């Protein structure tokens, strides 16, 4: 199994070929036809046959390709945060598009009615679940939606924040 993996890596140019890893049992293309006896023979112009010699395969020199920088490195340098003050559930599209593009979203639902705000928060919770992000309550009606690659650091001011965040149903006002 390791031999097959090694040959595949050599074929794809991911590893350099070592002659000790290549066995004689490896099928190779042959330029000469096989005789009925099963041995390979070459027919010369004079009609006599001679045993064909195996010549080493020519391998072109391979230059390794350098990987392009990952887009994750660019995402680590966060430059924008989208703040949305939705007035109705119809504004959910702008929240979803920004979050899907990898931008953290601050969603302030204080201008909405309780039922519509709950519906929008449920949408946001499903959105962050589907895209492996997270949602945090900042204040009673302000939520932070963060993509999976964004880390939110707490500065240790837990005195002002309740230990367990209240849901929209518990908050009046």
Curated annotation (Swiss-Prot):
Gene Ontology annotations for the cellular component aspect, listed alphabetically: cytoplasm
InterPro entries tied to this protein: Cell_div_SepF (IPR023052), Cell_div_SepF/SepF-rel (IPR007561), SepF-like_sf (IPR038594)
Low complexity: bias regions: 35-52
Pfam families the UniProt entry points to: SepF
Gene3D superfamilies noted in UniProt: SepF-like protein
A biological process term (GO) from this entry: FtsZ-dependent cytokinesis
Superkingdom, taxonomy of origin: Bacteria
Keyword Lipid metabolism among record annotations: no
Chief location category: cytoplasm
Localization per record: Cytoplasm
Keywords for this protein: Cell cycle, Cell division, Cytoplasm, Septation
Protein's UniProt keywords contain Cell division: yes
Region (Disordered): 17-85
Physiological role: Cell division protein that is part of the divisome complex and is recruited early to the Z-ring. Probably stimulates Z-ring formation, perhaps through the cross-linking of FtsZ protofilaments. Its function overlaps with FtsA.
Family: Belongs to the SepF family.
Quaternary organization: Homodimer. Interacts with FtsZ.
Name of this protein: Cell division protein SepF
Species name: Kocuria rhizophila (strain ATCC 9341 / DSM 348 / NBRC 103217 / DC2201)
Lineage: Bacteria, Bacillati, Actinomycetota, Actinomycetes, Micrococcales
């Amino acid at each position: 199994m390791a031999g097959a993996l090694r040959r595949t890596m050599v074929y794809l140019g991911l590893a350099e070929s070592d002659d000790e890893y290549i066995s004689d049992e490896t099928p190779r293309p042959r330029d000469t036809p096989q005789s009925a006896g099963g041995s390979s023979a070459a027919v010369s112009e004079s009609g006599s046959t001679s045993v064909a010699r195996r010549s080493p395969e020519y391998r072109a020199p391979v230059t390794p390709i350098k990987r392009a920088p990952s887009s994750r490195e660019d995402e680590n340098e966060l430059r924008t945060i989208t703040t949305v003050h939705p007035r109705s559930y119809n504004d959910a599209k702008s929240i979803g598009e920004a979050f899907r593009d990898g931008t953290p979203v601050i969603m302030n639902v204080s201008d909405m009615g309780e039922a519509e705000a709950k519906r929008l928060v449920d949408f946001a919770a499903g959105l962050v679940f589907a895209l492996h992000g997270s949602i945090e309550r900042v204040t009673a009606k302000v939520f932070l939606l963060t993509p999976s690659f964004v880390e939110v650091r707490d500065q240790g001011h837990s005195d002002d924040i309740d230990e367990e965040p209240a849901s929209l149903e518990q908050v009046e006002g």
